[in-house]
């Protein structure tokens, strides 16, 4: 079971392992957050795993502790294994605070795998460091696969990862504050556009907007919209098809403030005509 919108790789990862991905759609009207009732409706006797991503890429949606706990409890009660992708865990905006499923893993170590890395929260994309917290038996299996596929992380990256995780988080907090400021600026602008639905993201550095009400003969879908925006506005956006949400486009605000606002002004002129 994969709540949708989802990161593009999730379905293919399931296919590569011989499984069948089942997308559980959460619309913009729900803030792109799936409910227990929706998960229950999608459940089949063959279901084995729930993939849970919060904060989310592409939507920036962040489940509250109570929302998360309700979903975790449901999944455990239904006998599902939970894979929690928490790669954006430190990029959560006030009044929310980072909160990990690790609190549940301590109780159910054989039913949960927490997946994380340093690329996003620590801006260490080039160091290629990821890690998993799960049961030791599963760690052995994962090590066997990794050892024959990509090899281990180089020692320099490992040292850098230890320094990042054990050192002061001042730089992470500064980055989080900068992203929150940009989120506020970008969302205020996009939310003012007629016929565009864009929930206010609560984490990561994305906004995900439903633009289906803007479709016409020249722009029949989100992919056509992104092609037009690249051509006419010089702005690259990502259509929602690959994320399981074909009527949406993803905005990233991981750029300088002036670049962000200039880009949004260009997008507005093309989409809204103002």
Spans of model-derived segments:
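PLP-dependent class I/II
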Residues: 1-274
């Amino acid at each position: 079971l994969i709540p949708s919108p989802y990161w593009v790789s999730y379905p293919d990862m399931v296919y590569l392992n011989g499984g069948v991905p089942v997308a559980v759609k959460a619309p913009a009207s729900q803030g792109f957050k799936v409910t227990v009732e929706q998960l229950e409706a999608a459940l089949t006797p063959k279901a084995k795993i729930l993939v849970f991503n919060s904060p989310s890429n592409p939507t920036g949606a962040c489940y509250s502790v109570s929302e998360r706990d309700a979903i975790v409890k449901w999944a455990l009660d239904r006998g599902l294994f939970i894979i929690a992708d928490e790669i954006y865990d430190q990029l959560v905006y006030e009044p929310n605070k980072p909160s990990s499923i690790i609190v549940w893993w301590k109780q159910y170590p054989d039913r949960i795998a927490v997946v994380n890395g340093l690329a996003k929260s620590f801006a260490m994309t080039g160091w290629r460091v990821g890690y998993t917290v799960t049961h030791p038996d599963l760690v052995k299996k994962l090590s066997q696969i990794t050892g024959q596929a990509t090899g281990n992380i180089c020692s320099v990256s490992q040292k850098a990862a230890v320094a990042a995780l054990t050192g002061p988080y001042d730089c992470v907090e500064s980055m989080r504050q900068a992203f929150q400021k940009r989120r506020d600026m970008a969302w205020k602008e996009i939310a003012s556009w007629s016929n565009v639905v864009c929930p206010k993201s609560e984490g990561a550095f994305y906004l995900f907007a439903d633009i289906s009400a803007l479709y016409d003969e020249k722009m029949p879908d989100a992919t056509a919209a992104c092609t037009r925006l690249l051509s006419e506005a010089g702005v690259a956006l990502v259509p929602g098809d690959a994320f399981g949400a074909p009527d949406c486009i993803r905005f990233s605000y991981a750029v300088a403030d002036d670049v962000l606002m200039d880009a949004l002004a260009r997008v507005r002129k093309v989409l809204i005509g103002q």
